[in-house]
């Protein structure tokens, strides 16, 4: 036990080579463990993190890939920079489960701190067993006869730099497009494989219709490929909702339930 009363007298053992070796060894061990997963979730926003938590709690090996260095999607900035988001009943219960503080605004509306929400959702997903990796972009999908079989990944920094460096892969039983407004994984699948499918993109804002459509649009859109959150609405031409997030969390939970049913039926 370190006596924190004498911090000035502590001598720290810091060696550059040992630091490098420790990071490399831990990283290789981690990558070797996750190159085969049950579920890969692309996008660490509100729906993706929620989906990851519930799947990990079921005992599945879950890997969440986020191209940016920060998880949380569009939650951090709240509404137009004001540091709160809105969640409506009954989705507030999903936030209470992870200890997020809510302020009752009446009429079934609550506000939550826009920094606290993604932080606690991410910690809860990791505590449940999910692995979250940032700075990783999914540039393609692995396909097999029975559908999607994993993701093709690269460093987002490499992509941004425009360097021609070949990617690596993660095999999985299921892939989830939780990329938000872009629905980028669905678009990759359709465009690269010349599928006869329409990805209409999202419509303008109509919060009530958008929120309710989320739960209808959260589904398996191609064998072993699911959509949740705003990617579900974008891939089905649903409306956007703005800074009200209840449907996003419920969509993530519903997606986890659908995947759980699919994977357990395969066993």
Swiss-Prot record:
Molecular function GO terms recorded: iron ion binding; pentosyltransferase activity
Entry binding sites for Fe cation: 166, 181
Alphabetically ordered keywords of this record: Iron, Metal-binding, NAD, Thiamine biosynthesis, Transferase
InterPro entries given in the database record: FAD/NAD-bd_sf (IPR036188), Thi4_fam (IPR002922), Thi4_prok (IPR022828)
Biological-process GO terms, alphabetical: thiamine biosynthetic process; thiamine diphosphate biosynthetic process; thiazole biosynthetic process
UniProt cofactor(s): Fe(2+)
Entry binding sites for glycine: 240
Binding site for NAD(+): 47, 66-67, 74, 138, 164-166, 184, 230
Keyword Ribonucleoprotein appears in the UniProt entry: no
Reaction catalyzed: hydrogen sulfide + glycine + NAD(+) = ADP-5-ethyl-4-methylthiazole-2-carboxylate + nicotinamide + 3 H2O + H(+)
Source superkingdom: Archaea
Top class in the EC scheme: transferase
Cofactor descriptive note: Binds 1 Fe(2+) ion per subunit. Other divalent metal cations can support activity.
Pfam family, one: Thi4
Additional free-text comment from the UniProt record: Unlike THI4 from S.cerevisiae, Thi4 from M.jannaschii can catalyze multiple turnovers because the sulfide is not enzyme derived.
Biological function: Involved in the biosynthesis of the thiazole moiety of thiamine. Catalyzes the conversion of NAD and glycine to adenosine diphosphate 5-(2-hydroxyethyl)-4-methylthiazole-2-carboxylate (ADT), an adenylated thiazole intermediate, using free sulfide as a source of sulfur.
PANTHER family referenced in this protein's UniProt entry, alphabetically: THIAMINE THIAZOLE SYNTHASE
Family under the similarity heading: Belongs to the THI4 family.
Subunit architecture: Homooctamer; tetramer of dimers.
Record-given protein name: Thiamine thiazole synthase
Species whose genome carries this gene: Methanocaldococcus jannaschii (strain ATCC 43067 / DSM 2661 / JAL-1 / JCM 10045 / NBRC 100440)
Lineage, broadest ranks: Archaea, Methanobacteriati, Methanobacteriota, Methanomada group, Methanococci
